[in-house]
Swiss-Prot record:
This is Protein-arginine N-acetylglucosaminyltransferase NleB1. Belongs to the glycosyltransferase NleB family. Glycans are attached at residues 13, 53, 159, 293. Changing residue 145 to A: Strongly decreased protein-arginine N-acetylglucosaminyltransferase activity. It is found in: Secreted; Host cytoplasm. It comes from Escherichia coli O127:H6 (strain E2348/69 / EPEC).
């Protein structure tokens, strides 16, 4: 088995990294060293709420779920109060009414560091690809195989799907914009974190003048509860993600993702995978496989050790609180 994780990485976890950062500047995985890159106290925090059923809200309610079981709006407001020197972005999407958009504006007025960012107002076109190109590339790949190795059933499906692309909808991004399930969340989460600092600067939100378009961001699911300021974070090569552990089996999760710069190459690697497969998944391929590719992870490595290497964990964040309740969908 190849060498996996340098033992020095164990000090990279939230505030622990602060006290040891002068001693431990490097971590290693798969025989390669990576700098623990800082993510400073003014890096914006990003939440996301994509609402599939905006009609479920009463008049005068901000259309972000805020029940006893799922107090997501309260968690966001709590984060804005604690991290009052950071900009707190909320990327939203859904068929909101005029009155609901007014409630978003009222939320911004009441909490000056909260910025509502509408998905439709963000230019993600630099990350797009024609669906027809994705299908054609996969068709040509199948056609290049010897007849005995060709999957004719798959080839027929690909040709049929190519013919059925709706007029004016030949776009990977548009195909996800019309979904109303978890891949809708996951795909645009990846794109938003790719834009990172520029997500805040390009949408013309007031109060974001101190954010560099090239800077990173701290993404948190709305079920993550901040209990105190996060301070400076450190991440290997500038990226770390939440890790779940179930019966000692670990897995990369997208509930928390921190990056120190826009267009992080690990996320770009995941986007390349999304653009190469007709059945790609934004969580498994766009995030998980992209990070693994970037850090040269293979099946020869210890997966739990890789999860330890890339884990974002902080003593001032209570993670994944919705695991104790029923689905908010």
């Amino acid at each position: 088995m190849l060498s996996s994780l340098n033992v020095l990485q164990s000090s990279f976890r939230g505030k622990t990294a602060l006290s040891n950062s002068t001693l431990l500047q490097k971590v290693s995985f798969a025989g390669k060293e990576y700098s623990l890159e800082p993510i400073d106290e003014r890096t914006p925090i990003l939440f996301q709420w994509f609402e599939a059923r905006p009609e479920r809200y009463e008049k005068g309610e901000v259309p972000i779920l805020n029940t006893k079981e799922h107090p997501y709006l309260s968690n966001i407001i709590n984060a804005a109060k604690i991290e009052n020197e950071r900009i707190i972005g909320v990327l939203v999407d859904g068929n909101f009414t005029y009155e609901q958009k007014k409630e978003f504006l009222n939320l911004e007025n009441e909490h000056q560091n909260i910025k509502i960012i509408y998905r439709a107002d963000v230019d993600f076109s630099m990350y797009d690809k024609k669906l027809s190109d994705i299908y054609l590339e996969n068709i040509h790949k199948q056609e290049s195989y010897p007849a005995s190795e060709r999957d004719n059933y798959l080839l027929g499906l690909l040709r049929e799907e190519l013919k059925n692309i709706p007029e004016g909808k030949d776009s990977l991004i548009e195909s996800y914009a019309e979904k109303r399930e978890h891949t809708w969340f996951d795909f645009f989460r990846n794109l938003a974190i790719l834009k990172a600092g520029s997500l805040f600067t390009e949408t013309g939100k007031t109060g974001c003048h101190n954010i560099s378009p090239c800077s990173g961001c701290i993404y948190l699911d709305a079920d993550m509860i901040i209990t105190d300021k996060l301070g400076v974070l450190y991440a290997p090569d500038g990226i770390a993600v939440h890790v779940d552990c179930n019966d000692e089996i670990k897995s990369l999760e997208n509930g928390a993702i921190v990056v120190n710069r826009s267009n992080h190459p690990a996320l770009l690697a995941g986007l390349d995978i999304m653009k190469s497969k007709v059945d790609a998944h934004p969580y498994y391929d766009g995030l998980g496989k992209g990070i693994k590719r970037h850090f040269n992870y293979s099946s020869l490595h210890n997966y739990n050790a890789f999860c330890d290497f890339i884990e974002f964990k902080h003593e001032n964040i209570i993670p994944n609180t919705s695991m104790y309740t029923s689905s908010s969908w």
